Amino acid sequence: GEAMASADALHLVSGDGSLPLLDHVPEVLRVHLHLLEPHRGLYEDTLHRLVDGTPKRNLSLTKAALSRARKRDQALMASLLSMEGSRVSGNSTFSAERAKEVYGADAGVLWPCVDTEEFPQDPSGDPENPYPGNDEYVVCIGRASWAKGTWETVSMLSGTGLSLTHVG
């Protein structure tokens, strides 16, 4: 309402369900959308698969059921892209490329910021590594899922002698 009416611009970070906020943005307000990625559930089947890649349900039925949500998402992005002075940035070159593929948006890249103070020079105060071995290992962070490549990682490591530590 009032805050947006007096603002010069709006910075919106996309997330599940944030694009409908665009319905409430005055058309004269410049918007910068930091698009983390187009909604995977609407545009890819990766979220509709088990960790081994097996479909959770019939993928054709899932795609049909999500067609209305996909159209709504496309309409919201088309509305944003038609607003004068509005811009879209991805958080990686991959996200920027996906914005072009999915929405036709020419997106720049706004890299995530890293605070080097979070990583002290002296690691002696760090918690002890929970991995019991002294050999090399691979770390995966996040929920185990097909979308995050968990199964692909396990397959690629098979026979290499590398261990996998999964956190999350």
What are these regions (language model features)?
Residues 4, 39, 50-88, 95-97:
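Membrane-proximal helix-turn-helix segments that form the acceptor-binding/catalytic region
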Residues 6-8, 28-29, 83-86, 161:
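Short, well-ordered alpha-helix to beta-strand connector turns
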Residues 9-11, 25-59, 89, 108:
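Active-site proximal beta-strand in glycosyltransferases
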Residues 1-19:
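Active-site donor-binding segments of glycosyltransferases and PAPS-dependent sulfotransferases
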Residues 87-89, 124-148, 154-167:
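Conserved donor-binding/catalytic core segment of Leloir-type glycosyltransferases
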Residues 22-29, 80-83, 131-133:
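Short, conserved loop/helix-junction motifs that constitute active-site signature segments
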Residues 97, 102, 114-136:
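Acidic anion/phosphate-binding donor-loop and adjacent secondary structure
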